[in-house]
Amino acid sequence: MELKDYYAIMGVKPTDDLKTIKTAYRRLARKYHPDVSKEPDAEARFKEVAEAWEVLSDEQRRAEYDQLWQHRNDPQFNRQFQQHEGQPYNAEDFDDIFSSIFGQHGRHSHHRHAARGHDIEIEVAVFLEETLEEHQRTISYSVPVYNAFGLVEREIPRTLNVKIPAGVSNGQRIRLKGQGTPGENGGPNGDLWLVIHIAPHPLFDIVNQDLEVVLPLAPWEAALGAKVSVPTLKERILLTIPPGSQAGQRLRIKGKGLASKKHTGDLYAVIKIVMPPKPDEKTAALWQQLADAQSSFDPRQQWGKA
């Protein structure tokens, strides 16, 4: 029988760590999976990759394999190794082959090492109003179950009731320990990560911890000043508009923005001047009177100047 070069099969170096080997294995397993690959030798390559992974993924077996490979050109080793000629060779036979060549003193009892499960990440949409207080949320997600080749064999649906804390922000990650995929050989489960996505709001834009709302004003409200009703996340308030307000001007409403553990933002009302519909004869005359009274005013006086 032939002692295969498992590192060459996996396209890795003997000095590579388990993470690198695992990445290579998953890539090759997907590439040569008989249900996916169109290559004529895909099934044979797939089995070869799986065989290499089963040995190299286990610390004890990998150490034994490295010792076998180191002695592969030793004549005495070859005589003993050839005794296994013709027998099927897989990872389970590996322990027996090693023992028959080196004896029981050359190896330790075989143990599979515990491995941590995979983390799962899901997006959770939250409305702006929901960020004001802690609230309960029922979430559903799927836990993948991997086969011996590292491919997803099936998915198990799971439902959890979770608490979304007050003051969450867009992109914030919330960890639910142990709610990911199960660990292997007694290893700990992976975690579930909730990634918060603040849903777009029809009125408010988010700027860090602050909020912005467009405030439509009639020209005379901006010119003369007024008290207008403005929406916030909790209720409507009366906002005083100072005389001579300009389009684009931001009026600060303190403490009406987004809250976090350390800071509460502000709400900014951004003024937008809204003209009335096409004026009738009477209204046009009034506009003309205003124009005559302000004939010296040129809004484009500084326009285009450095």
Swiss-Prot record:
SUPFAM superfamilies: Chaperone J-domain, HSP40/DnaJ peptide-binding domain. InterPro entries: DNA-bd_curved-DNA (IPR023859), DnaJ_C (IPR002939), DnaJ_domain (IPR001623), DnaJ_domain_CS (IPR018253), HSP40/DnaJ_pept-bd (IPR008971), J_dom_sf (IPR036869). It comes from the Bacteria. NCBIfam families: PRK10266.1 (NF007618). The keyword Cytoplasm applies. GO terms for cellular component: cytoplasm; nucleoid. The keyword Nucleotidyltransferase does not apply. Pfam families: DnaJ, DnaJ_C. Keywords: Chaperone, Cytoplasm, DNA-binding. One of its GO terms (biological process) is protein refolding. This is Curved DNA-binding protein. DNA-binding protein that preferentially recognizes a curved DNA sequence. It is probably a functional analog of DnaJ; displays overlapping activities with DnaJ, but functions under different conditions, probably acting as a molecular chaperone in an adaptive response to environmental stresses other than heat shock. Lacks autonomous chaperone activity; binds native substrates and targets them for recognition by DnaK. Its activity is inhibited by the binding of CbpM. It is found in: Cytoplasm, Nucleoid. PROSITE patterns: DNAJ_1, DNAJ_2. The lineage of its organism: Bacteria, Pseudomonadati, Pseudomonadota, Gammaproteobacteria, Enterobacterales. One of its GO terms (molecular function) is unfolded protein binding. Residues 5-69 form the J domain. SMART domains: DnaJ (SM00271).
